[in-house]
Amino acid sequence: MESNLSGLVPAAGLVPALPPTVTLGLTAAYTALYALLFFSVYAQLWLVLLYGHKRLSYQTVFLALCLLWAALRTTLFSFYFRDTPRANRLGPLPFWLLYCCPVCLQFFTLTLMNLYFVQVVFKAKAKRRPEMSRGLLAVRGAFVGASLLFLLVNVLCAVLSRQRQAQPWVLLLVRVLVSDSLFVICALSLAACLCLVARRAPSTSIYLEAKGTSVCQAAAIGGAMVLLYASRACYNLAALALAPRSRLDAFDYDWYNVSDQADLVNDLGNKGYLVFGLILFVWELLPTTLLVGFFRVHRPPQDLSTSRILNGQVFGSRSYFFDRAGHCEDEGCSWEHSRSESTSMSGSLGSGSWYGAIGREPGWGGASQTRTTPLLFSQVPGPGSHHHSLYSTPQT
């Protein structure tokens, strides 16, 4: 590697871009940020067990991916305290785990975000169009296929790069084109899902609020993810197109594979290391932190007086994420229907009559009968009717 560097850059004119103390401080700051995120996600996973949430859900899968991602990034930056040369001479598997796998994990979190909002949209439409359930399976298969393609391309490029079996320019071109194109496609699909969620706000808001968020919060987080991931992909594609083939290591366009730049730290100074850290903060740490906050574990509602009744089931005003997937199958019309029935029931009870009591005869006691039939007898019970108490919504 030293011969390659000597042919590219003359060693006589090189001076450190940053003092050693600043470099050490940057390394400590990077490591501390990723370690803090690691312990935060680790605590969230323990809260899942403590609160008795579902162990396999969108939330737990996302948190597990973020935990692995933060652990790999923390391990990578820990090398830069004293053992930078060792980090640059890793075998194919450790090289891929530390440098390439975190990007794959980030793409998986983006597809997971897409799948969640696609599920929200499909569940809102499934009430009137039951065949939409088959479309949801097709969309899930498409995102799984995209994830596998992303993983396969990155693994092959990492192995070929370490074994020197292909030209570096060809490997970079293939990886950047495939990976960043998939990032852009997933970002655009996320934007489309957010538009559909916003258009169907009355029906989708019930599902989102039952999971501990709202349409505005989901749109804000999703919009930020679209901007961050799309800008990252555009940056990589533009920098690769503008970089000359004879000087692949001139700038940190390949920022998610820092091994192309890490072996230049001692020779070119630390300017590239500073740029790499800033880019990782904006395009890796920031979006992951936002998503961790979005998928955070909520405490189950304790006070039933602040809960709402929806189709015979109790929902807190801030119930937790992704733990009751079947609660809001019937949004929209069912919610409005149950709310109108609850209003009628409360009006009948508030008039002084016992729930289910038969109205008095007209003219009884000199007063005219103006009340309507109580709610209990407003509908003819079907063969599948259930007993309804004051705390359950009538099932139709």
From Swiss-Prot:
Coiled-coil residue windows: none
According to its UniProt entry, one GO biological process term is: autophagy
- Which ranges make up the Cytoplasmic topological domains here? 53-60, 111-140, 197-217, 296-396
Regions of this protein lying in the Lumenal compartment:
1-31, 82-89, 162-175, 243-274
Membrane-protein topology: Multi-pass membrane protein
| Keywords associated with the record | Autophagy, Glycoprotein, Lysosome, Membrane, Transmembrane, Transmembrane helix
Provide the transmembrane region boundaries.
Answer: 32-52, 61-81, 90-110, 141-161, 176-196, 218-242, 275-295
Would the keyword Membrane turn up in this protein's UniProt record?
Answer: yes
- Write out the GO cellular component annotations: lysosomal membrane
- List, alphabetically, the InterPro entries matched: GPR137
Glycosylated where?
N4, N257
Q: Does the keyword field hold Glycoprotein?
A: yes
Q: Where in the cell is it found?
A: Lysosome membrane
Q: What does this protein do?
A: Lysosomal integral membrane protein that may regulate MTORC1 complex translocation to lysosomes. May play a role in autophagy.
What the record says about family reads: Belongs to the GPR137 family.
Q: What is this protein called?
A: Integral membrane protein GPR137
Please report the organism this UniProt entry assigns to the protein: Mus musculus
Instruction: Tell me the lineage of the source organism.
Output: Eukaryota, Metazoa, Chordata, Craniata, Vertebrata
